[in-house]
């Protein structure tokens, strides 16, 4: 759960500002930006993950760049080490990076869709009452965008905690996620389909609970706006 939580938090910290800034731009810029955000999603999931393996491996593009820039040599002089490359593949950081790269659009899209539909008369009314930009964001925009935030968190956390391809390809199989655990129960040496089915059912219940909370929260926000 830890890596999935970290990836979800990073996606939220990156995705919310991006969504908010996009909503304030012109329509032409927004369309172009959304195409660029969605462009990687048109590629196969495994191919996207393989590309990060090529970038992060010991002789990969990133380590070659560090060698050409002298960053590895500088690090060796400062620390007294004799590293030939930075170990980035088969680490927790690589797994989190793969999750963020693959699932960040799932955080941006629901938040953006909520913010772009906000009633601008509410923002204007808040400004007319003397609220500055920070207060308008904190008192109006943020509360009304929480349904999108909850939706984004659900859409990122659930696939992050259940994936096994990213943890195996970028983490070397050393980081065990729920997806890895379920796969082992059905296909691995620890054959226990009953346990695998139980874990899958628990994950499905978590998704259902999250959806119910989102719907309930969204109804509360709509009632608050009407009042």
Where are these regions (language model features)?
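Periplasmic/extracellular loop-to-transmembrane helix junction in inner-membrane transport proteins
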Residues: 1-9, 25, 84, 184-191
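Membrane-interfacial helix termini and adjacent extracytoplasmic/periplasmic loops
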Residues: 49-100, 134, 170-174
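C-terminal transmembrane helix and the adjacent membrane-cytosol boundary/short C-terminal tail
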Residues: 112-123, 127, 197-227
């Amino acid at each position: 759960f830890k890596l999935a939580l970290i990836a979800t938090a990073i996606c939220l910290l990156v995705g919310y500002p991006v969504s908010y800034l996009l909503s304030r731009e012109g329509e032409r810029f927004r369309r172009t930006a959304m195409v660029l955000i969605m462009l990687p999603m048109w590629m196969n999931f495994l191919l996207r993950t393989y590309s990060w393996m090529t970038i992060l491996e010991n002789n990969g593009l990133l380590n070659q760049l560090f060698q050409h820039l002298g960053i590895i040599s500088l690090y060796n002089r400062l620390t007294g080490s004799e590293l030939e490359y930075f170990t980035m593949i088969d680490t927790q950081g690589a797994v989190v990076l793969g999750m963020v790269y693959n699932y960040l659009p799932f955080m941006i899209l629901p938040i953006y869709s909520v913010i772009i539909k906000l009633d601008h008369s509410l923002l204007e009314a808040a400004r007319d009452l003397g609220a500055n930009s920070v207060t308008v964001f904190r008192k109006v925009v943020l509360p009304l965008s929480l349904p999108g935030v909850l939706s984004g968190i659900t859409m990122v956390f659930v696939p992050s905690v259940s994936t096994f391809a990213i943890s195996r390809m970028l983490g070397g199989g050393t980081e065990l996620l729920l997806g890895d655990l379920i796969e082992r129960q059905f296909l691995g040496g620890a054959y226990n389909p009953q346990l695998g089915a139980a874990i899958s059912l628990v994950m499905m219940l978590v998704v259902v609970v999250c959806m119910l909370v989102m719907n309930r929260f969204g109804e509360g926000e709509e009632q608050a706006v009407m009042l």
